[in-house]
UniProtKB/Swiss-Prot annotation:
The keyword Heme does not apply. NCBIfam families: orc1/cdc6 family replication initiation protein (TIGR02928), PRK00411.1-3 (NF001625). Keywords: ATP-binding, DNA replication, DNA-binding, Nucleotide-binding. It comes from Pyrococcus abyssi (strain GE5 / Orsay). GO terms for molecular function: ATP binding; ATP hydrolysis activity; DNA binding. It holds the Pfam family Cdc6_C. GO terms for biological process: DNA replication. Involved in regulation of DNA replication. Binds specifically to the oriC region. This is ORC1-type DNA replication protein. SMART domains: AAA, Cdc6_C. The gene is cdc6.
Amino acid sequence: MSEGEQLHLDKLFERLLKARKIFKNKEVLRHSYTPKDLPHRHEQIEALAQILVPVLKGETPSNIFVYGKTGTGKTVTVKFVTEELKKVSQKYNIPVEVIYINCEIVDTHYRVLANIVNHFKDETGIEVPLVGWPTDEVYAKLKQVIDMKERFVIIVLDEIDKLVKKSGDEVLYSLTRINTELKRAKVSVIGISNDLKFKEYLDPRVLSSLSEEEVVFPPYDANQLKDILTQRAEEAFYPGVLEEGVIPLCAALAAREHGDARKALDLLRVAGEIAEREGASKVTEKHVWRAQEKIEQDMMEEVIKTLPLQSKVLLYAIVLLDENGDLPANTGEVYSVYRELCEYLDLEPLTQRRISDLINELDMLGIINAKVVSKGRYGRTKEIRLNVTPYKIRNVFRYDYAIQPLLTVSLKGGQRRLL
Ligand SMILES: Nc1ncnc2c1ncn2[C@@H]1O[C@H](COP(=O)(O)OP(=O)(O)OP(=O)(O)O)[C@@H](O)[C@H]1O
């Protein structure tokens, strides 16, 4: 459009909208969406239903421990079954409450109890603040509100390992024994985890009461992931938009990473977004490969964002060396730039030995490559290179107040001194 021409935004939006012929309903591919059917999880659905069905006869069901690797459908399946149970129970006039708690966010004894009490706040008018009360008092309140009437309360503790690692198993001890202290209501707990090691942190009594029943979620194989994606794709994309190889490729890439359905769905969604943005009429395998790259890069950015400050300064030293044309560098060369940066920031530098450990950590995270090479009679040394572009790293650091002051410094030619 020439300078003098008027920009008609309404027309522009309409034109852009018309060009969007890829997604019929993208929401279907989001993590929060619960599909109407869960292919390849019928066995687990039935196992959970068998354990929970006593509720419909007024009997207390066992506590359940659900485990399996990430993206194997644990959360979606438990939510699906408990919500169905809630619906069916209405027919039998048996009140069922399902309380879902994500322990990655709600990760202390106190907050778990407070969340349970507050779940009933519309009914009871009681709301516990998220800090401040003595824990015993919150627990007493919890018993009081739950026991106000005859009902079944199913407490789902997702990512239960995070809770136990952060705050111990005291809250599980109380909740799995609470029925002996209630007169009207009955409670059962469903714990979900993708980390089996956390069981070692549990008191054996807690372990045996939590694991009265166990339901295992095995990883999906590529064919199963294909079915899951095909079902979602029917609702998410316009007909004929996906090239034949797209779903099998997404499924194969995700199967390689321990059969993670979340990863498979992400690949399909991002491939569609890339195709849409470039105005393509079809999603092709090329888009899937680019989606894979983008997801990996985004993950890398997240990892860099959450590094401790010392590792960020170290990484920035490597960025400066790269921009100065000085990579590969050895540990000593990186260390001397790192020390100067610490001085610039007024930060106490770590020893070279410790920095060598942090270099290994960055290598393990895939951010840098630190290859050990032999220098003949001079012994062995590391050759350090960057695996992420300096541009990407600078972009992440731009929003980081602690490291921001460094972004304007650069190295002085061969001397590797700060400018
Ligand atoms: N059998 C299935 N059919 C359809 N969608 C599925 C199926 N299994 C998993 N999904 C989808 O994959 C994504 C991940 O599933 P979910 O969150 O239940 O995994 P998870 O096992 O709880 O993982 P994590 O341990 O990481 O929390 C969700 O978007 C979910 O809807």
